[in-house]
């Protein structure tokens, strides 16, 4: 009989023995492996926290008590324990459950996450709200050691300690960043100190020593120094105690018989407490334990062998082209340095890091620092290339404006995962960068339509004396044969790809490919539609675009970005400034967060594939007035 299938709510965990909970942990791991082997997802992180998740739900009264998961990569066991077993096979699929905690999905999901280092801030805010209402519920932030490289986490630790809030922070140390398990003695010392009685006795002893005549304060200082020296010698606890937290741990995150009592003791303590739990990423699946980075975010794989199913041949990815090209460029230009924020492999920079270790910087999950660090490099004559996912560049917006663009520094931004990314959904789609970059003074923004244009954009970036960004998508490139050498692009110059007399499509970025196919479809219906690749979001090629708009009288803009403030808006502004009365249809993403699904499903749903573009143009041409996505200038 399956314990997982019969579990109605996490409250039932309180009635199970440790042996039964261990059986349940095994069933959860099996279900996660079975599902992710089919759907893909964040496997290693979730396998590493199965026992921790069980222990938290065993000790806490969820959903009254709240667990805030940092990033959310590790939340699969949490989802299985909180009523989503029957839908777990839809994980990360169109219309299915999210790969991250999502408040609208379950009352057990306390906070929507997807980006790193936010959990302590959110949980602290919830604790402050509780105190305003004189509540008693508990709030727990679960954060990985990698996420602690984000400065926001330390900002929250600082406030929590200063305000002495009742808050529990679980540091999930999966041996990837901070520390190894530091041994039995340290574990024993700290585990003994979790007892509520011991903590109370410790405080009473401090009070007693403090009141001893004449020498009391000196005795108290000596006692505290002795305690700190002993613990600091064996553990990293002093760091967190300096923030005003009581430190507990390290604890073995896979031993329920010790983890549960420790958490029960911690739950009754006053003030902020940090519990250091050591886990193994990929626990229970040998291939993931041996290669946790590969199985961090993984596609479908063979669950018997762990072999990841290779995609069907085809061209290299845009990311791969970027990485190999930058490595080759760095051989010819020793000013080029590469910077990423804990995304070495994701941004394609592994080979660069091996070839040029002194010119490669992984700054951790610290996008703000990455950008200003690059600004410092640029000040001293280097040509830094900051490689970030579009969604994470959002976190460094002020640094882009204030520290780079304001000084017109030659920093290049390689914006990966631009546009719709697929199964990771709304937290990871890169659909706002056109809008938040194009209004920044001194900024040049390029959206290459293919891998050759990407190479040209990269060369342009390292030659340009000012900030420049180029944006490319997730997934395979077009399969074009790459030349031995490329030329840089003239700033602000687009290219006409196809002539036509009835209308013109301005398609920015990789949607050029779909626009050309749409033009073919429409040609078969008797409509002659030109296609222009503007290349540059900023500055626009006004001479080319205005000439084409004036010639045809009908303009269609296509972009893989929200329509608000994006490329279509830039074209409208240009035409309005010119006083040119033409009909304009903007095709892009609507004013809402876009759900998860495959890239192809989402392109079709939002009319960004060839058929969708052709249908929109057809309808626009056959009606005197367009739909809500169109704008007429008169």
Curated annotation (Swiss-Prot):
Q: Name one GO cellular component term.
A: cytosol
Q: Which reaction does it catalyse?
A: D-glyceraldehyde 3-phosphate + pyruvate + H(+) = 1-deoxy-D-xylulose 5-phosphate + CO2
Q: Which InterPro entries match?
A: Dxylulose-5-P_synthase (IPR005477), THDP-binding (IPR029061), Transketo_C/PFOR_II (IPR009014), Transketolase-like_Pyr-bd (IPR005475), Transketolase_BS (IPR020826), Transketolase_C (IPR033248), Transketolase_CS (IPR049557)
EC number(s) per entry: 2.2.1.7
By its UniProt entry, which CDD domains does this protein fall under? TPP_DXS, TPP_PYR_DXS_TK_like
What is this protein for, i.e. what is its function? Answer: Catalyzes the acyloin condensation reaction between C atoms 2 and 3 of pyruvate and glyceraldehyde 3-phosphate to yield 1-deoxy-D-xylulose-5-phosphate (DXP).
The protein's organism comes out as: Syntrophotalea carbinolica (strain DSM 2380 / NBRC 103641 / GraBd1)
What is the protein's given name?
1-deoxy-D-xylulose-5-phosphate synthase
Per its UniProt record, the required cofactor names are: Mg(2+); thiamine diphosphate
Disulphide-bonded residues: none
In which residues is thiamine diphosphate bound? 73, 114-116, 146-147, 174, 285, 367
Pathway assignment reads: Metabolic intermediate biosynthesis; 1-deoxy-D-xylulose 5-phosphate biosynthesis; 1-deoxy-D-xylulose 5-phosphate from D-glyceraldehyde 3-phosphate and pyruvate: step 1/1
Q: Which Gene3D superfamilies match?
A: 3.40.50.920, 3.40.50.970
Quaternary structure?
Homodimer.
According to the record, cofactor stoichiometry and binding are noted as: Binds 1 Mg(2+) ion per subunit.
């Amino acid at each position: 009989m399956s314990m997982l299938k019969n579990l109605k709510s996490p409250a039932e965990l309180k009635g199970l023995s440790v042996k039964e909970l261990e059986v349940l942990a095994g069933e959860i791991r099996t279900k996660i492996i079975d599902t992710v082997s089919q759907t893909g997802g964040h496997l290693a992180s979730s396998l590493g926290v199965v026992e921790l998740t069980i222990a938290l739900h065993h000790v806490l009264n969820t959903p009254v008590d709240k667990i805030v998961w940092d990033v959310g990569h590790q939340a699969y066991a949490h989802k299985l324990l909180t009523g989503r077993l029957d839908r777990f096979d839809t994980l990360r699929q169109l219309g299915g459950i999210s790969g991250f905690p999502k408040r609208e999905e379950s009352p057990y999901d306390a906070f929507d996450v997807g980006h790193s280092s936010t959990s302590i801030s959110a949980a602290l805010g919830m604790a402050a709200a509780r105190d305003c209402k004189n509540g008693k519920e508990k709030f727990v932030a679960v954060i990985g050691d990698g996420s602690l490289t984000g400065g926001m986490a330390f900002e929250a630790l600082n406030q929590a300690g200063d305000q002495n809030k009742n808050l529990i922070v679980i540091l999930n140390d999966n041996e990837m960043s901070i520390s190894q398990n530091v041994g039995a003695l340290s574990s024993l010392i700290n585990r003994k100190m979790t007892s509520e009685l011991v903590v109370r006795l410790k405080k009473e002893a401090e009070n007693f020593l403090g009141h001893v005549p004449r020498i009391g304060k000196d005795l108290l200082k000596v006692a505290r120094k002795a305690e700190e020296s002993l613990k600091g010698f064996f553990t990293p606890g002093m760091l967190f105690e300096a923030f005003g937290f009581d430190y507990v741990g390290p604890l073995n995150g896979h031993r329920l018989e010790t983890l549960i009592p420790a958490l029960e003791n911690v739950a009754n303590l006053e003030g902020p407490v940090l519990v250091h739990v050591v886990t193994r990423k990929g626990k229970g699946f040998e291939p993931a334990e041996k290669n946790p980075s590969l199985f961090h975010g993984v596609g479908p794989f063979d669950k018997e062998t762990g072999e990841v199913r290779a995609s069907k041949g085809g061209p290299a990815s845009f990311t791969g082209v970027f990485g190999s090209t930058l490595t080759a460029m760095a051989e010819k230009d020793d000013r080029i340095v590469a910077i990423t924020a804990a995304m070495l492999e994701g941004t394609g920079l592994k080979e660069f890091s091996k070839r040029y270790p002194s010119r490669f910087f992984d700054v951790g999950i610290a996008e703000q620092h990455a950008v200003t660090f690059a600004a410092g490099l640029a000040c001293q004559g280097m040509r830094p290339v900051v490689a970030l996912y579009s969604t994470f560049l959002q976190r460094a917006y002020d640094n882009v404006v204030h520290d780079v663009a304001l000084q017109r520094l030659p920093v290049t931004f390689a914006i990966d995962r631009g546009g719709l990314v697929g199964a990771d959904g709304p937290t990871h789609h890169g659909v706002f960068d056109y809008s938040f970059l194009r209004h920044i003074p001194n900024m040049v923004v390029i959206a290459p339509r293919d891998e050759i244009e990407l190479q040209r954009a990269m060369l342009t970036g390292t030659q340009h004396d000012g900030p420049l960004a180029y944006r490319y998508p997730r997934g395979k490139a077009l399969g074009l044969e790459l030349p031995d050498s490329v030329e840089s692009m003239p700033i602000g110059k687009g290219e006409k790809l196809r002539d036509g007399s009835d209308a013109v499509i301005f398609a920015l970025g990789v949607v050029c490919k779909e626009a050309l196919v749409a033009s073919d479809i429409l040609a078969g219906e008797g409509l002659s539609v030109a296609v222009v690749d503007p290349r540059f979001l900023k500055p626009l090629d006004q001479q080319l675009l205005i000439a084409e708009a004036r010639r045809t009288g009908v303009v269609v803009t296509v972009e893989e970005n929200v329509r608000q403030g994006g490329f279509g808006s830039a074209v409208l502004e240009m035409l309005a400034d010119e006083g040119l009365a033409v009909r304009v249809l903007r095709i892009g993403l609507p004013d809402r967060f876009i759900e998860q699904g495959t890239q192809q499903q989402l392109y079709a749903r939002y009319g960004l594939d060839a058929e969708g573009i052709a249908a929109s143009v057809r309808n626009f041409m056959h009606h005197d007035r367009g739909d809500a996505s169109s704008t007429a200038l008169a």
